[in-house]
Amino acid sequence: MVKNSFISVIPQEEKEKNKGSVEFQVFSFTNKIRRLTSHLELHRKDYLSQRGLRKILGKRQRLLAYLSKKNRVRYKELIGRLDIREPKTR
C-alpha cells in the first residue's frame, strides 16, 4: 500500500504550520482510517487492526464534536472537504 495514495486537501504550507490544529489532526486520522479500512478488506480477521481502527474512529469523533462546539463553520467546511458523514445526534 502506498502511503501517498490519498489526495491531500490541506496545502503543504498549512501542514508545516498547523500540525497541532484540530483540522490537521482530523485530516491525519481520516487518512489512517482509510488506510486501515483498505487493509481490513483484505485481512478480515486482523483483530488488532480492527481495535486500532475503532480507537482512531473514537478519537476523530471526539475531535469533530469539539470542533462543532467551538466553530460550526470550520466544522462544516472540514466535513465537506474530507467527505465525512455527520455523526448521528441522539
Swiss-Prot record:
Subunit structure: Part of the 30S ribosomal subunit.
Family: Belongs to the universal ribosomal protein uS15 family.
Keyword annotations from UniProtKB, A to Z: Chloroplast, Plastid, Ribonucleoprotein, Ribosomal protein
Species: Liriodendron tulipifera
A single GO BP: translation
Any GO CC annotation of this UniProt entry: chloroplast
GO MF annotations in UniProt: structural constituent of ribosome
Listed name of the protein: Small ribosomal subunit protein uS15c
SUPFAM superfamilies from the UniProt entry: S15/NS1 RNA-binding domain (SSF47060)
